[in-house]
């Protein structure tokens, strides 16, 4: 009887909230929490002054958002919120915001255990719905009605297949990275070189092997720009671990996608928590048959963070790496896969080498065989100020025949045979000169004769 009463009450509440939502929408009295969080602190302060909120100069951005929401609700405004769910051990959860890098804050949205069970929600689900102000004795805004889960109808979330039960396949759909050079002044050929040397597919697990100051961050920015331009259906996440704050700002302003970061002045536990939230969010989206790309800078620093956080096993490898420390970062990187019957998770991460740290070398060696694509950057090329500083002969993709047409693949192999006797610097200089004379790789290949398929592969 009690369960029936609760269900009928819930249905009544949903009907009422729908009617309220429609009424508010007609009057335009709706605040979108996500859009509010994207505002600059100056804009929030101006809005708070209009609402006559006191002591705004002493409030942090999250506290300012909370104060604006509370005041708006008092004035009869409806609030629609969105966030990524983090389920706590007690059974309830909170919607964390990517705008604040999934940090816990006063503007988080509470979700009850009954709502989590009803819709089959898990950590990482992107939930959108109508929220209400905290009642007496409550500290957080609460979710009143679920409108969408992972950008789809909530009913679909309950019947999805768990990520670990999905069947992984080799990448067989190309991820378009080539950007046409429309002007002679354009000097960025990085994505065109990657297309020729190490083509990427949806579900790729790629490592960018990079010594310091070889242009890895700029290369990641170019890849991100190419993905958003050529593959609008892809959900892009850029994950910056242990980075400098100014590089985070630069990435946020240059990339049209979700950029989340944990800077070098934050503890290792924070790096780990952010990485776990990002990978769980990506898995939930893949369960809904979506294509997700995560760009990680850097896998090495993430592994260092896990090494600090993991309980000591008593077995220490060379360089001070705990024997169990690399299991979880490997699980993170290993989540990249192409899924049978739809969906894919692509991870492109940078691995640092030649840093002078023995630990970094050990981490790289552990990750070396786990990827199915490698882009190797060369310090000698970068010292000559030749970018992208890609070592062509050492870079490549496994099973590239699944991604590239046979005729194009044969021409790529011939190109490698021509370049092989050259040194790394001469090879990239030779290729860049040829690319400067053409707008696209298609034009570049038309300049080459159609060869027969090589008998011995590469």
From Swiss-Prot:
What keywords are annotated for this sequence in UniProt? Answer: ATP-binding, Helicase, Hydrolase, Nucleotide-binding, RNA-binding, Transcription, Transcription regulation, Transcription termination
Q: Name one GO biological process term.
A: DNA-templated transcription termination
Q: Which CDD domains match?
A: Rho_CSD, rho_factor_C
Provide ranges: composition bias, Low complexity.
10-23
- Rho RNA-BD domain location, by residue? 78-153
Q: Does the keyword Cell cycle apply?
A: no
Q: Which GO terms describe its molecular function?
A: ATP binding; ATP hydrolysis activity; ATP-dependent activity, acting on RNA; helicase activity; RNA binding
What InterPro entries does the record tag this protein with? AAA+_ATPase (IPR003593), ATPase_F1/V1/A1_a/bsu_nucl-bd (IPR000194), CSD (IPR011129), NA-bd_OB-fold (IPR012340), P-loop_NTPase (IPR027417), Rho-like_N (IPR011112), Rho_factor_ATP-bd (IPR041703), Rho_N_sf (IPR036269)
Residues engaged in binding ATP: 201-206, 213-218, 244
Region: Disordered, residue numbers: 1-23
Which SUPFAM superfamilies does this chain map to? Answer: Nucleic acid-binding proteins, P-loop containing nucleoside triphosphate hydrolases, Rho N-terminal domain-like
Leading EC class: hydrolase
Instruction: Supply the EC number(s).
Output: 3.6.4.-
GO cellular component terms listed in the entry, alphabetical order: cytosol
> Which PANTHER family does this UniProt record tie to the protein?
TRANSCRIPTION TERMINATION FACTOR RHO (PTHR46425:SF1)
Purpose: Facilitates transcription termination by a mechanism that involves Rho binding to the nascent RNA, activation of Rho's RNA-dependent ATPase activity, and release of the mRNA from the DNA template.
The entry sums up its family as follows: Belongs to the Rho family.
Q: What is this protein called?
A: Transcription termination factor Rho
Q: Which species does this protein come from?
A: Rickettsia conorii (strain ATCC VR-613 / Malish 7)
């Amino acid at each position: 009887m009690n369960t029936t009463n609760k269900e009928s009450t819930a249905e009544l509440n949903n009907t009422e909230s729908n009617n309220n939502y429609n009424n508010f929408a007609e009057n335009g009295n709706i605040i979108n929490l996500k859009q509010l969080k994207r505002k600059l602190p100056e804009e929030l302060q101006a809005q708070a002054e209009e609402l006559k909120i006191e002591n705004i100069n002493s409030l942090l951005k999250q506290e300012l958002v909370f104060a604006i929401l509370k005041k708006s609700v008092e004035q009869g405004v409806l609030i629609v919120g969105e966030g990524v769910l983090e389920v706590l051990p007690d059974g309830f959860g909170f919607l964390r915001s990517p705008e604040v890098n999934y940090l816990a804050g006063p503007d988080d949205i509470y979700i009850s255990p009954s709502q989590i069970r009803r819709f089959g929600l898990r950590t990482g689900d992107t939930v959108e719905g109508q929220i209400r102000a905290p009642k007496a004795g409550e500290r957080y805004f609460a979710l009143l009605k679920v409108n969408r889960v992972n950008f789809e109808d909530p009913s679909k979330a309950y019947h999805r297949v768990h990520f670990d039960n999905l069947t992984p396949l080799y990448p067989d759909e190309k991820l378009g990275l080539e950007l046409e050079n429309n002007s002679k002044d354009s000097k960025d050929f990085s994505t065109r070189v990657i297309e020729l040397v190490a083509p990427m597919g949806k579900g790729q697990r790629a490592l960018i092997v990079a010594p310091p100051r070889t242009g890895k961050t700029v290369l990641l920015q170019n890849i991100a720009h190419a993905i958003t331009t050529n593959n609008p259906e892809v959900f892009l996440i850029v994950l910056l671990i242990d980075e400098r704050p100014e590089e985070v700002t630069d990435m946020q302003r240059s990339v049209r996608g979700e950029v989340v970061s944990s800077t070098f002045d934050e503890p290792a536990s924070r790096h780990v928590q952010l990485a776990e939230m990002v990978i769980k969010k990506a898995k939930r989206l893949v369960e809904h048959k979506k294509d997700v790309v995560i760009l990680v800078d850097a896998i090495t620093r993430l592994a260092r963070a896990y090494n600090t956080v993991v309980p000591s096993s008593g077995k220490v490898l060379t360089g001070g790496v705990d024997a169990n420390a690399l299991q979880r970062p490997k699980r993170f990187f290993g989540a990249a896969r192409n899924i049978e019957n739809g969906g894919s998770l692509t991870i492109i991460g940078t691995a640092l080498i030649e840093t002078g740290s023995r630990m970094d070398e050990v981490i790289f060696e552990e990750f070396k065989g786990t990827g199915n694509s490698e882009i190797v950057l060369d310090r000698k090329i970068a010292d000559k100020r030749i970018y992208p500083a890609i070592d062509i002969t050492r870079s490549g993709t496994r099973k590239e025949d699944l991604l590239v047409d046979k005729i194009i693949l044969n021409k790529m192999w011939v190109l490698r045979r021509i370049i092989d006797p050259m040194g790394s610097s001469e090879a990239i200089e030779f290729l860049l000169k040829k690319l400067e004379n053409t707008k696209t790789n298609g034009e570049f290949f038309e300049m080459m004769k159609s060869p027969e398929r090589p008998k011995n592969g590469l």
